[in-house]
């Protein structure tokens, strides 16, 4: 039994981020008109449109955690046009620890990530961590 391609795509995105391989993310995983929705009031919150903005967000997230950020997917549940991932996010910044669980919802179009919504378990903690 082969793995659902939506699961493979989601897993590949987390693997590429873990390796810092943003070129692979850009060239193979993101749709041209990709949109990331990031909740909150912190410096990373907002809506990122297009590959350049999304990759800028991912690079800034990594930079603000001194490269310590880790996204560990617990489960990946494919749907018809959305794929849901329960994920643990960990990192360190200025001596503070981040350890949060949340949900990422991906819209996958033509085999690429076209949209992602982030739903952290503790949004207040995420905002405080990045202040």
Q: For the regions a protein language model found, what residue spans apply to each?
A:
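C-terminal and inter-domain tail/linker signature
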Residues: 1-131
């Amino acid at each position: 039994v082969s793995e659902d391609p939506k699961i493979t795509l989601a897993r590949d995105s987390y693997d590429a981020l873990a390796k810092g391989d943003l070129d692979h993310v850009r060239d193979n995983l993101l749709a041209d008109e990709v949109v990331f929705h990031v909740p909150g009031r912190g410096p990373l919150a907002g809506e990122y449109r297009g590959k350049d903005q999304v990759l800028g967000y991912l690079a800034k997230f990594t930079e603000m955690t001194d490269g310590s950020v880790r996204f560990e997917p617990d489960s990946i549940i494919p749907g018809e046009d959305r794929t849901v991932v329960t994920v643990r996010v960990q990192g360190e910044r200025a001596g503070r620890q981040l350890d949060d669980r949340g949900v990422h919802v991906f819209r996958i179009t033509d085999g690429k990530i076209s949209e992602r919504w982030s739903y952290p378990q503790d949004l207040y903690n995420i905002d405080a961590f990045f202040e």
